Structures are given as structure tokens and as C-alpha cells.
Amino acid sequence: MRRHLQLGIKQLTAGYINGHLSPLSVAEQALQDASSLKTLNAFVCMATDLALQQAKESAQRYADQRSLGSLDGVTIAIKDNFCTSQVPTTCASRMLQDFVPPYDATVCARLREAGAVLLGKTNLDQFAMGAGTVDSIYGPTKNIWSESFAADNWRIAGGSSGGSASAVAAGLCYAAIGSDTGGSTRNPASYCGVVGLKPTYGLCSRHGLIPLVNSMDVPGILTRSVSDCVEVLNAIAGPDALDSTTIRQPYKKLQLPEVEQIDLRSLRIGIPKEYHCDALSTEVLETWTKVADLLECAGASVRQVSLPHTAASIFVYSILNQCEVASNMARYDGIEYGHRAADERSTEQLYAQTRAEGFNQVVKTRILTGNFLLLRKNYDHYFEKALRVRRLIAEDFAKVFEASAANEQVDILLTPTTLSEAPLYKDFAALSNRDQCAVQDFCTQPANMAGIPAVSIPVRLSTAGLPLSLQLMSNSLNEQLLLTVARWIEAQVEFDCLESLQRHVASL
Amino acid sequence: MLRISARFYCKIATQSSFKAAEYKNKIKKDKKLNFTQLLHPTKVPQTPVPAAFSDPSENVVEIDTKTIQLLERLSLVDLDSDQALATLKSSIQFADKIAHIDTQNVRPLYTVLEKQQLQLRNDQVTAGDSRAELLRCAKVTDEDYYVSPPGNIPLEQ
């Protein structure tokens, strides 16, 4: 057992400072572990040389007592839809299979400047379109909590940031960056038993994040604890001149109170009743019920609230997603970068052939559907209509967070993240990508509609021994309170993110 | 320096056991929360809450050949199988489910940052000359140009 894996980021860097641990040996072991755990398929590309180089530089900085701060020498992984200078960035698609960006996404640049050691790029559904990390040209990512890795009897990692979640859950890195458009960070976090944060829209720069749905995409953070999540958020958040959709007010670094100092007595928790939908599993319901009770026992006021447009949200999300995808995917034509087909008969023919070869069926169908919904005769009926309903969904949240009567207001919403534990691959693959997204994203995509922050935290294991998680949501820019409550719950439930590793050993 | 054991910890990597962790685990299990015990009447609905909006009848979506050809031209991807057509139709059916929601006097929400003024920057060159870097990403170039086959030829359908 790598003892340092049990440490949080703060303790790890404390170990670097006092010389008990070294960034270089931690990075070397992480690379070694990643190669022993190849069966998980968490990484699509290891940045071995770069990682060792960065780790050496970090070790030197510690030796010189001029460390760059709380992430210096911390091993991280980044989802393969963030541009990384000199490291291939593929979106797990043939279209970008040999694309090496000439620049860093802002998130990557800030992590680099903070001294973090990039181990490699993680797997995802092609162009982040999916909820399972099963639609990748590099094959599916497996969940470390699986009872077995044989045939198709293993559990999916969730998606689309499944590689990032799997890497953190397996102890291959301390933190990973994902992206979240409709739940792509929180969904795999829930299935893999790690913390997954979707920050407020505009808090973290999207510059260099290959766009899926511009009006909803946010960089996400996956870690094994809430405190680690805060460390990463503090490094990447804040305005960016390169992304005009970042929130302009300066970012004030979060500092969470110690668990013993968290007082919930003035906290108002809302339970949105519409989140109990048909497919919710008994065990998730039981978990949701118990944690609500725990909060109430600690003095928080807990009450049921209504977000009446919740059930409509998944349809609106599907429309907006396909429309923005149709527009965003228009950039891939084979001329300036990415895959280029051999068809030289005409420009149009080259474009079409390039796209036929570069995109998978999921991407193609979303483009076609998006263009149908955007046809002049359909534009108002579908696209504009969806944007109007989107306002109703956002207003549902505003009503509970900003109600004029104080006794009707809530500070935090508590809901499930996913409707069940991680499904078996064979069960998941039995449904189409579109049908799966409608189920998988039910509880997560409303937060993206409204741009509000949301976090998934693991709570306990199901009878099958798989993580069950819950989601907290709060008003825009209320990350401080959101994560404080998450930290309190984390301390009560004492979920051990690395238990799967021990269990794999114990079961033999 | 603290000694980091080189032993692997996962069944895929090794077959060795790790007693200490098991032991620690056992202690932890003993004081685990009882998830069926509640101290307050719960506020979490114990039965599914039916959707507050009704489903329109499953209207049959028909798409004519002309529309399909138009979509293929606009999308520059081919609708190459019956399964793809079925998915397209079912996605449209799925989208139809919000048709009956009353949105009278509701403005479209294009961005959640609508209250923030979009920041404009001065029209000045801020980035360096990156011609070589950018051209390197292309598969075919000629001197400082991207190369494409002849244009203005309609797509064969």
C-alpha cells in the first residue's frame, strides 16, 4: 500500500516541505501504478517524460525552499478534451486523434503555473457526448469498484469524465480535471465514489476546453476529499481575459472551516420533491433520506420544496445540446487541423468524407438532429421554445434560493446525483446513448441549465459494495457554503474512497 | 525520507494481502451509520413524484427524403443507416415533449450571465506570430497556405 495515497493534498505538500516525501518518487510511483492498472483504461495518453520533468523541477523548488504553493508537486490528470500544449488532445475521437494543440487551456496553464505534475490525459466519451465513458475510440473505462473485470461483467465508470473519476478513485492521482455540461463530472464521481464539483458557470475559464455546449460547459474537479477539491478550485478559478464568459468579479480563495467549527443551525436545506423520479433505486432513496435526517439532527432546518419544471429539464437539455453540438462540430472539416480524408474530388466532398470517418454514430446523429431542430421552420418551435423553458427552470431555482419571504428560502438543495449505483457494462450498453443520457442526467443537468454550482459526494456503499452518492446544489457563486456543507457530510459518513483498493486485495 | 513501500495494493497488480488496512476497515464498519434509523419525520418523498406536466401523445415523426438530403448537406455527415434514422426520429419525438408547456411572455434564456455585460477588449494584437505553429496542425499545406480541393462543386448525394 502506498501510504502517501491516504494523505490529502495539504498533508502531501507538508510532506514535501519537511522532506519526508518527494514529488519525484510520488510521480514515479503514480506512473508505475497507472501502468499496472492499465486494465481500467483511465488514461488515453501518459505524459511520462513531461511528468518526470515537472516532478524534478518541483523537487528542486522544495529543496530551494521556493515552492509554488499548495499544488506544487501534486500529481493530477486532465480530461482529454482540454488543450494541453505539446501533449496530444483527442476528445477520444478519430477526428482529433493526432491533434497536438499549440497552446494550454487556461485551466491547464494555471495548474502548470501552480506546480502540479500532469501525469496524462484521461478517457471520455467521444467529444464528451455520453454518460458512461463507453463511446471512446480507446475503448471503455472501467470502474475500480467492479466486482470483476472479466468479459463485460464489470461496472462502468460513468461519464463523460469517466477516465478522470476512475484515475482519482484508483489512487493514480490526487486530483483530476473533468468537464461538466449536463453532469459529466458529477455522474462518474458518483459511480466511482469520489468528490465531483461543477462550479458556477463562468467561475472557471473555458478557454481551451473543446466546446460541447458553450452555454453550459464548465471545467469540473474530481478529488478524494472536499478539502482537496478546494485546493484545486482555488488554483483554477477566477476571471480570464481569454474567455469573455468568465465572471468578472475577482475570485476570493475559499477557506473552509474545520469540521468541528461548522455550525448548521442557521442552515436551510431544501429537498426538491421532483427529484424522486420513477427510476430512483431504493438504496439511493434510503441514503438521501438518511443524510437529510443527519442534517436535521445537526440543527439545520430541512423542508420539502418544489422545482416544478424539473421533469421538463431533460428534454430542454437534449434540444439545446444537439443544437449547440450541430454548430460547434461545424469546425471539423479536415483543413486546418485534425483528421483529413483522402477524398480530393471537391471541398464539400472532402469535408463530408472527413466527418464520416472522424465522428462516431452518436456525434453524427446529434449533429443531424441539431440541424433539424434549427431548420428555419423548426427554430421557434424547438430551439427558442427550449430557451424559454430554460428560463422557467432557472427561475424555479431562483425562487427557492431568493424567495422574498425568508421562511421560504433555502441555502442548499439536497438530491441524488445518479439514480442508482454504477451499472454493469452489459446492462448499460443495452440501451442507446440517447436513452441512457435521459436517465443518467436526470438529477444533474438542471444545475447546468441555471449555471449554479453543484457537488457530488460519496456517502456509503450499496449492498453490492458500490458507492452511492448524493448531490448538493446552491445559488450561483455560493461555493463556500456548498463545500462547507459537503465537508460536514463527508465527516459524518466517513466514506473511504480508497477502500476498493484494499478490498481487491482482501477478496483474493 | 519516509519509506514508501513498493508493494502493490490492488488485485490486478498483486496477489499479496494487506492486513492492516483490513483491520482498520473492520473497526470503521462497527461504528457505521445506520441508514434505516431516522430521528425526524422525513421530508424526502418516499414515493416517486409524478411529472407535473403531461406527455403529449407519441406523435409519429415523418421526415421526407428532401429534408434528409437537406440535413445531410447542412451537416456534411451522412444519415447512413436505418438505425440512425430511427434515432433521429426518436430524438425529435423526445424534443416534442416540451411543446405544450406554457411559455407565454417568457423570454428565451440564452446565457445565465445575461445580467453581466460582455467584456470587450481593445482591437489590438495581443498574441505573437504563431503562423508556423498553426500551420503545423494541418495535414496539407503549401508554403504558408492551407490546401483544399476545388470548391463550388455540389456534394454528391
From Swiss-Prot, chain B:
**Subcellular localization, as worded in the UniProt entry:** Mitochondrion
SUPFAM superfamilies recorded: Glu-tRNAGln amidotransferase C subunit
Highest taxon in the source lineage: Eukaryota
The parts of the chain that form a coiled coil are: none
Pfam families (alphabetical) = GatC (PF02686)
Catalytic activity field: L-glutamyl-tRNA(Gln) + L-glutamine + ATP + H2O = L-glutaminyl-tRNA(Gln) + L-glutamate + ADP + phosphate + H(+)
Task: Give the record's subunit note.
Answer: Subunit of the heterotrimeric GatCAB amidotransferase (AdT) complex, composed of A, B and C subunits.
Q: What does this protein do?
A: Allows the formation of correctly charged Gln-tRNA(Gln) through the transamidation of misacylated Glu-tRNA(Gln) in the mitochondria. The reaction takes place in the presence of glutamine and ATP through an activated gamma-phospho-Glu-tRNA(Gln).
In which family does this protein belong, per the annotation?
A: Belongs to the GatC family.
The protein, known as:
Glutamyl-tRNA(Gln) amidotransferase subunit C, mitochondrial
> Which species is this record about?
Drosophila virilis (Fruit fly)
